[in-house]
Amino acid sequence: MPLKLSLKPGEKFVLNGAVVQNGDRRGVLVLQNKASVLREKDIMQPDQVTTPARHIYFPVMMMYLDEVGAEKFYEEFATRLNEFMGVVRNPVVLQDCIAISKHVMAREYYKALMLSRKLIEYEDERLGHVSSGVSAGGDAG
């Protein structure tokens, strides 16, 4: 099933590791086969990895963007997820953590990434952090 991306003028996204930027008008991109696509709003820079949930999101994002080299990021992901689960008591959040782990084990990195975003939202609510680069919602896949 094709993936249709509606792009804002100048919007950047990563497509199979390449940074691509839309022109000066709105545009539509239709991907006919499987590809790793991540919109600019979903990309976290290393300097934005400042909280435990972001320490989970970042290696999942890297696994998604670099599936061939995913094992380089797995240990960091597993360590950080384990630490996070050790301090969280909310059963819904713990279920999300388990689901993230299952998605990563199945190499379903985009699904894991979108669930990881929920951890950031939970953390922001609890800790009162201002969002730092990863917005809620998303429509790339």
UniProtKB/Swiss-Prot annotation:
One of its GO terms (biological process) is negative regulation of bacterial-type flagellum assembly. Keywords: Bacterial flagellum biogenesis, Repressor, RNA-binding. The keyword Repressor applies. GO terms for molecular function: mRNA 5'-UTR binding. Pfam families: FlbT. It comes from the Bacteria. NCBIfam families: PRK00794.1-1. Has a post-transcriptional repressor function in flagellum biogenesis. Associates with the 5'-UTR of fljK mRNA and promotes its degradation. Belongs to the FlbT family. This is Probable flagellum biosynthesis repressor protein FlbT. It comes from Caulobacter vibrioides (strain NA1000 / CB15N) (Caulobacter crescentus). The gene is flbT.
